[in-house]
């Protein structure tokens, strides 16, 4: 004989949680907006403005993820209740197990939607840029920066995000001095925003013939791509624009033309650069887009005293602003903010970051 009371309790719990989310996420307004967006996308002239059409498509996906999930929860819980009644009437354990399996699936769906509640920031749904900067320490720090770059690229690709390397400056011997990547996809910035900070590596250096332990630092800085219609006043006189020859992998045209562009915002010292296109004009446009995004993020941080100022994040690559410690000899990676720790160091370096990211989001960092 199967126990029905615990299952009924779970159904009641999931129903209550679904109703809470329905109110919190403003289901009625989102459903109405989804109908409006669908109507706009059905207009034959919608693709006359490709950027507008793409924005609507992105908005539709975001709305559907909420509206459809809540609809599925309501219908699914009704279906499970019906299956449960059938199982009791027929004393059929197979039908009971089917109801429990369906309930497990619904619980997982709801948990994912509840997790998305944490993406409530203005730009959490935006695409984002990730800057990686090697700290002092020469080759060892530069190798660590390249390991971080690989880790984030692996994480993003595993989660289905699109990645693009905007700029990469190679180290003298190995690794990289710096890199900027763009990560595109739903809630890219929301997922990655708590990764800003200093990452500390402790290991026996492969570049030390004595095999001694070395401590290296590299920083990650995450900032959202901002909409073109946001007014950010940049005085052209405050900008220094340099062109240079691209370095690194890039085919036969690398180093032949000065197509790479570096822009410096003199009042703040913020630097953006792009070298991933053969066209200097396109690289300049991309670097300006990043500059706009960085200046916007700086303004937001100034308004929020709890966030670190961008200058600190970019300049203090040392003990002060550490977020995570990677001690490879002891097989231990620990997040210094949440206390989350794992001994599976290789999995983390291969992109298994969700446990750290989810804990930091749940902690409200």
From Swiss-Prot:
Family named by the database record: Belongs to the prokaryotic/mitochondrial release factor family.
Keywords associated with the record: Cytoplasm, Methylation, Protein biosynthesis
Function in brief: Peptide chain release factor 2 directs the termination of translation in response to the peptide chain termination codons UGA and UAA.
PROSITE patterns reported in the protein's UniProt record: RF_PROK_I
GO process terms (BP): viral translational frameshifting
Protein name: Peptide chain release factor 2
Predominant place of localization: cytoplasm
Record-linked PANTHER family: CLASS I PEPTIDE CHAIN RELEASE FACTOR (PTHR43116:SF3), PEPTIDE CHAIN RELEASE FACTOR 2 (PTHR43116)
Superkingdom of origin organism: Bacteria
Record PTM: Methylated by PrmC. Methylation increases the termination efficiency of RF2.
Gene name, Swiss-Prot/TrEMBL: prfB
GO molecular function, one term: translation release factor activity, codon specific
Residues with N5-methylglutamine modification: 252
Additional detail: The gene for this protein contains a UGA in-frame termination codon after Leu-25; a naturally occurring frameshift enables complete translation of RF-2. This provides a mechanism for the protein to regulate its own production.
Subcellular location: Cytoplasm
GO CC annotations on file: cytoplasm
Gene3D superfamilies recorded: 3.30.160.20, 3.30.70.1660, Release factor
């Amino acid at each position: 004989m199967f126990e029905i009371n615990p299952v009924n309790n779970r159904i009641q719990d999931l129903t209550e949680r679904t109703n809470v989310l329905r109110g919190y996420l403003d289901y009625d307004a989102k459903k109405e907006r989804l109908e409006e967006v669908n109507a706009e996308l059905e207009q034959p002239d919608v693709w006359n403005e490709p950027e507008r059409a793409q924005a609507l498509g992105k908005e539709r996906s975001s709305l559907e993820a909420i509206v459809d999930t809540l609809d599925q929860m309501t219908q699914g819980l009704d279906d499970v209740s019906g299956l449960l009644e059938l199982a009791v009437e027929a004393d059929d354990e197979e039908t009971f197990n089917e109801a429990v399996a369906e309930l497990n699936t619904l619980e997982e769906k709801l948990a994912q939607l509840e997790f998305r509640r944490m993406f409530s920031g203005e730009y959490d749904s935006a695409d984002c840029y990730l800057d990686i900067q090697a700290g002092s320490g020469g080759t060892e720090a530069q190798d660590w920066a390249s390991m971080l770059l690989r880790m984030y690229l692996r994480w993003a690709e595993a989660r289905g995000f699109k990645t693009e390397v905007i700029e990469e400056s190679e180290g003298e011997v190995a690794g990289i001095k710096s890199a900027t990547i763009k990560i595109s996809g739903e809630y890219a910035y929301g997922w990655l925003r708590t990764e800003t900070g200093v990452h500390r590596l402790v290991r026996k250096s492969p570049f030390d013939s004595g095999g001694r332990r070395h401590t290296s630092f590299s920083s990650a800085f995450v900032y959202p791509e901002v909409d073109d219609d946001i007014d950010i006043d940049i005085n052209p006189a405050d900008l220094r624009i340099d062109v240079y020859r691209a370095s690194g992998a890039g085919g036969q045209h690398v180093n032949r033309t000065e197509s790479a562009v570096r822009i410096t915002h003199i009042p703040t010292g913020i630097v953006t650069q792009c070298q991933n296109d053969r066209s200097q004009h396109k690289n300049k446009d991309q670097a300006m887009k990043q500059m706009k995004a960085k200046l916007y993020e700086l303004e937001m941080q100034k308004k929020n005293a709890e966030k670190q100022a961008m200058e600190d994040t970019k300049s203090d690559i040392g003990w002060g602003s550490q977020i995570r410690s990677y001690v490879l000899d002891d097989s231990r990676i620990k997040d210094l903010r949440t206390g989350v720790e794992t001994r599976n160091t290789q999995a983390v370096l291969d992109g298994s970051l969700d446990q750290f990211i989810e804990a930091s989001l749940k902690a409200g960092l």
